């Protein structure tokens, strides 16, 4: 399984190269990791590309929208930083809070997209509810991701990028599935409900 995780990791990184496909790539990465690696269904690459095609439009929309949103917040944060006044300091903290909330929503949004079929706006709302309701999980996942990125940039060799995203995704499924199951309907009789195993 470790070999498949590395292969999926490489495919994931290649899929992110167009940039606007990052959201779709993350969604498909989680889907294949959960279904094929953890639940031994089908082939990882087959499931990855199946999810990629299915979520391409929504995933791309999220990526572009998030890029614009974060760029706007960063721009406003820098304007507030230049002001050097109490109001500017308050606004910096406010914009930082918005970034944290955005990150918390995104942590759940891509797994939600991989599992549920609904409007994108409904997915965002559901992800926000999950982030608040399961705040300890949200904190662990966000802190873990930030810590991994920091450690990789500061201490680990560059080639580790071919390992750590897959390792984080695999580990993250154990917490994420506990959350997703709370919102999933009971499986129909005869259904291959791999996500309930």
Predicted regions and their residues:
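Helix-coil boundary and N-terminal low-complexity module in membrane systems
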Residues: 1-95, 102-197
């Amino acid at each position: 399984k470790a070999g498949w995780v590395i292969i999926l990791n490489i495919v994931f990184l290649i899929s992110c190269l167009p940039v606007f496909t990052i959201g779709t790539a993350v969604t498909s990465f989680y889907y294949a990791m959960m279904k094929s690696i953890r639940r031994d269904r089908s082939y990882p690459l087959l499931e990855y590309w199946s999810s990629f095609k299915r979520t391409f439009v929504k995933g791309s929309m999220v990526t572009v929208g998030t890029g614009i949103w974060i760029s706007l917040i960063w721009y406003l944060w820098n304007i507030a930083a230049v002001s050097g006044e109490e109001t500017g300091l308050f606004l910096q903290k406010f914009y930082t809070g918005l970034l944290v909330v955005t990150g918390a929503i995104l942590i759940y949004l891509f797994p939600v997209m991989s599992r549920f079929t609904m409007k994108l706006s409904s997915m965002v709302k559901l992800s926000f509810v999950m982030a608040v309701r399961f705040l300890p999980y949200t904190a662990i996942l966000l802190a873990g991701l930030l810590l991994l990125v920091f450690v990789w940039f500061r201490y680990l060799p560059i080639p580790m990028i071919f390992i750590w995203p897959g390792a984080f995704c695999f580990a993250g499924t154990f917490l994420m599935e506990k959350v997703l199951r709370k919102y999933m309907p009971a499986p129909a009789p005869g259904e291959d409900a791999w996500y309930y195993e």
